[in-house]
Amino acid sequence: MFNLKNRNFLTLMDFTPKEINYFLDLARDLKRAKYTGTEVQRMKGKNIALIFEKASTRTRCAFEVGAKDQGAHVTYLGPTGSHIGKKESAADTARVLGRMYDGIEYRGFGQEIVETLAEYAGVPVWNGLTDEDHPTQILADFLTIREHFNKPLNEIKFAYVGDGANNMANALMIGAVKMGMDFRIVSPKEIPTDAALVAKCKEIAAETGAKVTITDNIEEGVKGCDVLYTDVWVSMGEPDSVWESKIKLLTPYRVDMNMIKMTGNPDAKFMHCLPAFHDEETAVGKEIKEKYGLSEMEVSHELFESKYSIVFDEAENRMHTIKAVMVATLGDQ
């Protein structure tokens, strides 16, 4: 039994492979308990603050439902619902909320903000997404891979295809090297992955048996892969001005049925943290169609709706894994 009580959850860099497996095992057990109606509440009477400086569907719902299932109460502080960063510093906000709440979630901008909250709050702080990292998403991804593949994570070959500089590329690389995976980032050279992070991850890979490959060659990058993963080409907070250049660079990297076939693996799966621009059924999708003539962006509609896609299992698992993080760090054992 691992005791992760009162630990912050800021990045998977802070956790050992055994601790990450513990989160995944706990999430699996909590999911089974919810499905069978045998869930035991371990956070009764706890109060949790959810700070969201960026919009959210899955992360907010996962924290709210997970907390409610476990008997905790939540306060949602949206983009206009608190003074953090505007009238009050992150350090001061942390010291106020830490007096009132048992745990604090933060979704927003710089990684340094969530780290400051953790330094000053005196209660567990959980990273719901920053510009640099998205660790709760990675737990959901790895639980989903466990459910769909009859082999351990250290035998998985995984390619992230698209914007190699965004927070999902970073977060997946960190998680993958911790768990000993064969991990590839397949991205244009013009969008480089953070060199210091790559170097750090290669150091970890040397200890865990993982492999890290950064390439702009799609065929080489996806060959033999079990999982192809992508994310939006323009992340929250990036200016509209980057759309045109990103589309030009990344259109050849759209994940589609042909790319799945390039893996040579009939059991390969497609994953995406969502939301995905795979059709014209959203305001942004319509705008992209009008401006750039594209009816799909980072993933083809055909692949998104195909048997290879496990994106909605992945989305559901956000709740089970986030619940596991809260129970492990805050719950009564």
From Swiss-Prot:
EC number: 2.1.3.3
A biological process term (GO) from this entry: arginine catabolic process to ornithine
Subcellular location: Cytoplasm
One Pfam short name: OTCace_N
Catalysed reaction, written as an equation: carbamoyl phosphate + L-ornithine = L-citrulline + phosphate + H(+)
Pathway: Amino-acid degradation; L-arginine degradation via ADI pathway; carbamoyl phosphate from L-arginine: step 2/2
Cellular component terms per the entry's GO annotation: cytoplasm
InterPro entries: Asp/Orn_carbamoyltranf_P-bd, Asp/Orn_carbamoylTrfase, Asp/Orn_carbamoylTrfase_sf, Asp_carbamoyltransf_Asp/Orn-bd, Orn/put_carbamltrans, OTCase_ArgI
Family annotation (Gene3D superfamilies): Aspartate/ornithine carbamoyltransferase
Record flagged with keyword Cytoplasm: yes
Signal peptide: none
Molecular function via GO: amino acid binding; ornithine carbamoyltransferase activity
Transmembrane segments: none
Positions annotated to bind L-ornithine: 167, 231, 235-236
Residues binding carbamoyl phosphate, per UniProt: 56-59, 107, 134-137, 273-274, 318
Function: Reversibly catalyzes the transfer of the carbamoyl group from carbamoyl phosphate (CP) to the N(epsilon) atom of ornithine (ORN) to produce L-citrulline.
HAMAP family: OTCase (MF_01109)
Protein's name in the database: Ornithine carbamoyltransferase
Gene that encodes the chain: arcB
